[in-house]
């Protein structure tokens, strides 16, 4: 079978497609993905939807990169109890990866950027890079995100951060990583 999302024909994703996130909807699927420009150095988050995963249609940019938040990618989406959606994403700033947050009334947006939900911690295993991961929703009053964190020399680890029920405020964060690479 042919892939349902392919690079091109426009310049905005001709350099490649990566980092898919699939959201099952009542009437089909939504897929967020990173589209890489032809220069292979810049990208942004795109959105596709369709009745099945083999019949997706590209709908355009989900969250554009900006001067302050470059290379938006790696979506984690969650609907909150009030029906609003949260879009966590990775972006580039100051030569590092960060986790951003945007809110929207629909899984397709439009999205309103919010303050950065959590930052690197000085003198810690996650003091430089941060990248989104999946949300564990076993306790809907305390969603937990597993995230990637690293030092400036890119020694990556996996940690966790807990949010309030609406994913709008951090209420706890692990001091030590949950997963570390072998020595």
Show where each model-derived region lies.
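Beta-rich carbohydrate-recognition and catalytic domains
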Residues: 1-15, 23-127, 137-183
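Functionally critical, mid-to-C-terminal surface segments that flank or help form catalytic/ligand
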Residues: 133-134
């Amino acid at each position: 079978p042919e892939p349902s999302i392919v690079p091109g024909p426009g310049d905005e994703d001709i350099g490649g497609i990566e980092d898919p996130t699939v959201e099952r909807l009542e009437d089909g699927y939504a897929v967020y993905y990173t589209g890489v420009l032809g220069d292979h150095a810049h990208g942004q988050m795109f959105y596709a939807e369709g009745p099945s995963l083999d019949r997706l249609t590209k709908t355009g940019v989900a969250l554009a990169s900006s001067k302050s938040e470059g290379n938006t990618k790696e979506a984690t989406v969650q609907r909150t109890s009030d029906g609003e959606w949260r879009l966590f994403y990775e972006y580039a700033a100051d030569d590092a990866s960060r986790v951003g947050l945007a809110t929207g009334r629909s899984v397709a947006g439009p999205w309103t950027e919010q303050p950065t939900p959590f930052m690197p911690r000085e003198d810690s295993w996650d003091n430089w890079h941060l990248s989104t991961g999946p949300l564990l929703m076993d306790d809907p009053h305390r969603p937990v995100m597993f995230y990637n964190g690293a030092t400036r020399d890119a020694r990556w680890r996996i940690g966790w951060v807990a949010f309030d029920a609406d994913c709008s405020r951090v209420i706890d964060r692990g001091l030590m990583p949950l997963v570390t690479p072998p020595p």
